[in-house]
Amino acid sequence: MEQLVNELIEANVGRVLVDEPLARYTTMKIGGPADILIVPKHVAGIEKTLQLVKKYKTKWTVIGRGSNLLVSDLGIEGVVIRLGEGLDHLEVEKHRVRVGGGYPLIKLSTLLSRQGLAGLEFASGIPGSVGGAVYMNAGAHKSDISNILSKALILFEDGTIDWLTHEEMEFSYRTSVLQTKRPGIVLEAEFQLQIGEREGIVSVMQKNKDYRRETQPWNHPCAGSVFRNPIPYFAGDLIEKAGLRGYQIGGAQISEMHGNFIINTGGASAQDVLSLIALVKQTIKDKFSVEMHTEVEIIGR
């Protein structure tokens, strides 16, 4: 591991941090250390990192802004690549937008709305990066990334870089081809938006933000929606009907505001959250005969 660290530093891939606690990189403020954390300065840094990872046959994981993650208390084995700096470029040409995978999604939706571009209003309250949003087909307010993405530039596990079209991304509810079938890193996304009326777009954005502020516990560390909606039901409704609102294990609590959110009340461990998730799954299955599946990504040892 020491030799890999030295080569990463010599290759100038970006910041190289050893045994770096990941709690500071997730919105839930939970997570043990990464053996090696890389914050790349540019695409070339990511490519070189993957070359060295392959050379040393080391496991690797990519995270964005940590908004949809639950990281194990034991941390993550191998190399963790955190996207953000160096992948935050933006190019707007009429209604076509090309943006780096590390660009903050809320910042992007706000900026484009002020320019009178419609299509990203749904993302006004979704934390995280563009790359993470494309990876999981993030959505809200009856829309999602699949409605606006035309193509994405992907760095695959074998080091090759290629564009995937909308069809090749194989989007479905909160999923894409990148999650299992063709794992890779979203370096850049191209969106096709619509030219609209600025005041109306900004108004919708503000309405969406207000709704989230009034109904979701963003004043506490959390990872967003924990469970996927088991269509035709809503996960939050089922959890609340089961009487689990406010239920707490350790420092993790099912939010009083919204049943599909688990908040860190202070000092919560990943195990606290996992125990709550298991409780919810079993309770909903027993009471309603409905299988619950997590939307939050659970990673680590």
Swiss-Prot record:
The active site is at R174, S225, E295. Pathway: Cell wall biogenesis; peptidoglycan biosynthesis. GO terms for molecular function: FAD binding; UDP-N-acetylmuramate dehydrogenase activity. Keywords: Cell cycle, Cell division, Cell shape, Cell wall biogenesis/degradation, Cytoplasm, FAD, Flavoprotein, NADP, Oxidoreductase, Peptidoglycan synthesis. Residues 29-196 form the FAD-binding PCMH-type domain. It catalyses: UDP-N-acetyl-alpha-D-muramate + NADP(+) = UDP-N-acetyl-3-O-(1-carboxyvinyl)-alpha-D-glucosamine + NADPH + H(+). One of its GO terms (cellular component) is cytosol. One of its GO terms (biological process) is cell wall organization. Its cofactor is FAD. Its EC number is 1.3.1.98. It is found in: Cytoplasm. Gene3D superfamilies: 3.30.465.10, UDP-N-acetylenolpyruvoylglucosamine reductase, C-terminal domain, Uridine Diphospho-n-acetylenolpyruvylglucosamine Reductase, domain 2. Belongs to the MurB family. Cell wall formation. This is UDP-N-acetylenolpyruvoylglucosamine reductase 1. It comes from Bacillus cereus (strain ATCC 10987 / NRS 248).
